[in-house]
């Protein structure tokens, strides 16, 4: 998703693994083994999408550390947003004797055949944060409440703009996540359940008229793609002095692209800078919130998600039923996948200290 090497380098300072920053090229192998404890030396394959986003680096590092502490051997792989590389990595994990797979997919529907191999070998599969679609080979799903993320963003915008009190009209533009990531659809649904009524009432005006998902989606959650689209929106609809009040972004990386386009067009923080949302509470995004370049983000504590996924792995490998709190929401076209949903939190300048620093997610000196 994000391709800023400096951001990745900064993020690594707080992550307990040494990986190379950057993107493109070949997929990364971060596999290692740990001494067997109560796990009986069982092997867990962890397939992550990319190292180009801070959150996936943290997710992988957290799970690897926690699984190894329990005595599991861990094969952690990053596919650098290369779908075929991820397919090959999963197939190799199966060949190398994985007893359980944890998969955060690049393309949610592209792993059907590889996962069928896992099922044929009686290997349980846990979908991690991104639902695996069109397969009956997935056992469980660990994620955040993705529709709730969209609702949080929508409610934040509603409050900040005073929409419930009838204020407006405001000029806004919308961005969505990657069309091949089921989370993007859930988030967008939650967002528009809050904001669509204000569009209908004329309190929110979209000068570009771009609101349908197929138009506002951003393949691979790409910062560069978002920047180009924002540049086109500015040049096409805001050259006559029209004020841009808000840009609704579903991800911090997309927000960086939006901000870059605005800066390139002469927008200035504290003068004509719009409200900008985001998701993931990345280090750079948090710095941008402090400086005013980004208004808010949604914090999804990856430590909590990693903890939950690790307990799922442990339960499954011990022949137990893992804790589940949702058995209705996540239909992948083949089955409703039993899920555990963690709770996201909206973060802005008013509460980043409490949520991100006091909780130990970041250290204060990282935000200087």
Language model region names:
Residues 5-13:
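Sec-dependent signal peptide recognition
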Residues 2-6, 23-368:
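A residue-level marker of the well-folded mature domains of exported/periplasmic proteins
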Residues 18-22:
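C-terminal motif of bacterial Sec signal peptides marking the signal peptidase cleavage site
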